[in-house]
Design a protein with these regions (language model features):
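Glycine-rich, flexible N-terminal cofactor/catalytic loop recognition
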Residues: 1-55
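Loop/turn-to-beta-strand initiation segments
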Residues: 1-2, 71-76, 152
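Short active-site oxyanion
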Residues: 23-29, 101-104, 152-153
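Conserved helicase motor
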Residues: 52-59, 132-134
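Glycine/small-residue-rich loop that forms an oxyanion/phosphate-binding "nest" at active or ligand-binding sites
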Residues: 54, 62-111
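Class I SAM-dependent methyltransferase SAM-binding "motif I" and its flanking Rossmann-like core
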Residues: 92-149
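A contiguous loop/helix-start segment that scaffolds small-molecule binding in enzyme catalytic cores
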Residues: 152, 156-222
């Protein structure tokens, strides 16, 4: 059995009783970064063996791990924060398990974009998840496509690229397109700023952002 286990995006209390039980009972935990995950596991007195599974090794390890799970091992997959496979490693392992007929269970739990979307004040009955934009090749093409998207858009971004992204989106979508920026979700300094793309770009030029960021942008003709 492979369990996909969401972990807190900020506050360590944002984890379910079921997730804690699974992490204690499985034979092995696969973690995106064992150092980061060790903090959570130590906090909850979980001593299950831990092994790295990240974007740099999942191409080589997913098939072997799926074979071990098929042979009877129970494994939990976690990421540094939030739900694995959502802009995080895990898809290749899930696919390898599915191809072998291995049962996969994804537990419900934390993910950063849901509170950011709800807090944005923008329409959320339909939305489009973009995740991380390309940093170089294909970036302008994605911007053009997003400019025509009619549903509210969800974009993950680095604090170091946020101003550039806001300025580029304003260029393709118009400076008056409404948006929100949520950062440090569920952490001590959680913050959401709302305004137009131009206003937000100007704000973060003057106040450089820190922490993990979710950008929500209203759809065309909203």
């Amino acid at each position: 059995m492979l369990y996909i286990v969401p972990t807190p995006v900020g506050n360590l209390e944002d984890i379910t009783f079921r997730a804690l039980r699974v992490l204690k009972e499985v034979d092995l935990i696969l973690a995106e970064d064992t150092r980061t995950s060790s903090v959570l596991l130590k906090h909850y007195d979980i001593h299950t063996p831990l092994k790295s599974h990240h974007k740099f090794n999942e191409h080589e390890t997913s098939d072997d791990m799926a074979e071990r799970i098929a042979a009877g091992m129970t494994v939990a997959l976690i990421s540094d924060a939030g739900t694995p496979c959502i802009s995080d490693p895990g898809f290749m392992l899930v696919r390898a398990c599915v191809e072998r007929g291995v049962e996969v269970q994804c537990l419900p739990g934390a993910t950063a974009f849901v509170p950011a979307l709800v807090n944005s004040g923008l329409p959320n009955d339909r939305f489009y998840f973009e995740g991380f934009l390309p940093q170089k090749k294909g970036r302008q093409t994605r911007m053009k496509i997003l400019a025509e998207q009619t549903h509210t858009m969800i974009i993950y971004e680095s604090p170091f690229r946020l101003v550039k992204t806001l300025e580029q989106l304003a260029e393709y979508m118009g400076a008056d397109r409404r948006a929100s920026v949520s950062r440090e979700i569920s952490k001590l300094h959680e913050d959401t700023q709302r305004g137009t793309l131009a206003e937000l770009a100007n704000h973060y030029k003057q106040t450089p952002p820190k922490g993990e960021i979710v950008l929500i942008v209203e759809g065309a003709n909203s």
